[in-house]
């Protein structure tokens, strides 16, 4: 449905050239939800704006539903864009128009009949859960309701693709959840292909089928959500996955934690990161028996994404230095990421 082939975008600044995208290729199948994740300034917004040519690539091709947009005339591009809806972080609603009138605007611009507009917009407001707000004005809506209006407006022309540019980043956590569930329902019921960009791995984990990681304008990793969570190949992907966990040491340990052991009875506090098959394997108990170390688990958390389990365990590891070293090596050989957080006396 969406094919980006070798997309490069260079901005000409007064004193230099800025490469926002560097030879990016991405393929999204029909009906998929794909998330592009990256830090601020990584090139995410530029990438998504290249899909409907709000930003024209310096080089490369953009193909949507079999049509190469980069080869269309201005008139042809206007028509092709009707198949591509888009929502933004900011809702861009017209304050002087009601909810119904805001959603109806694209159909009015296409000179649709009043009867068709009435039928279509009524159905869309029902879909996004705003039937009772049809005559309300944006000033009387919450942030989540405003985004629902924007989503309905983006769907008014029956697009095959929906682009979401940081659509939940201005919303509180509870509202974010409701918008993500709405997008997932729209994908399921309408079969619409969704490309969203975000800096939050939690968003990707909840609704995406596919994920691409972008860093400094380059696509550094991509695959299904399950593949990326089970076996992240880049440090950036690992950082994003870790950000979905909220685990910490008990205060008693934090107060006594040191970077280096102060004496022979100072034992390491180690964080073990499990993904894929290593989650279910009894590796910690095996290591304990094999090398004669004792592991006192301080905190642990397991989660799912894309049908794959992943998680962390933080433990105090007691034993002689050689045994602890062998334990760490053994676990790393079995695809467990090992990080010494410090030592307790």
Curated annotation (Swiss-Prot):
GO molecular function, one term: ATP binding
Compartment(s): Cell inner membrane
Keywords: Amino-acid transport, ATP-binding, Cell inner membrane, Cell membrane, Membrane, Nucleotide-binding, Translocase, Transport
EC numbers, comma separated: 7.4.2.11
Tagged with keyword ATP-binding: yes
Catalytic activity: L-methionine(out) + ATP + H2O = L-methionine(in) + ADP + phosphate + H(+); D-methionine(out) + ATP + H2O = D-methionine(in) + ADP + phosphate + H(+)
Residues annotated as binding ATP: 38-45
Database matches in Gene3D superfamilies: 3.30.70.260, P-loop containing nucleotide triphosphate hydrolases
Pfam families: ABC_tran, NIL
Principal location: membrane
Membrane-topology descriptor: Peripheral membrane protein
Domain ABC transporter: 2-241
InterPro entries (alphabetical): AAA+_ATPase, ABC_MetN_proteobac, ABC_transporter-like_ATP-bd, ABC_transporter-like_CS, ACT-like_dom_sf, MetN_ABC, MetN_ABC_transporter-like, NIL_domain
GO cellular component: Gram-negative-bacterium-type cell wall; plasma membrane
SMART domains, sorted: AAA (SM00382), NIL (SM00930)
PANTHER family for this protein: AMINO ACID IMPORT ATP-BINDING PROTEIN, METHIONINE IMPORT ATP-BINDING PROTEIN METN
Assembly mode: The complex is composed of two ATP-binding proteins (MetN), two transmembrane proteins (MetI) and a solute-binding protein (MetQ).
Family, similarity comment: Belongs to the ABC transporter superfamily. Methionine importer (TC 3.A.1.24) family.
Task of the protein: Part of the ABC transporter complex MetNIQ involved in methionine import. Responsible for energy coupling to the transport system.
Name of this chain's protein: Methionine import ATP-binding protein MetN
Organism lineage: Bacteria, Pseudomonadati, Pseudomonadota, Gammaproteobacteria, Pasteurellales
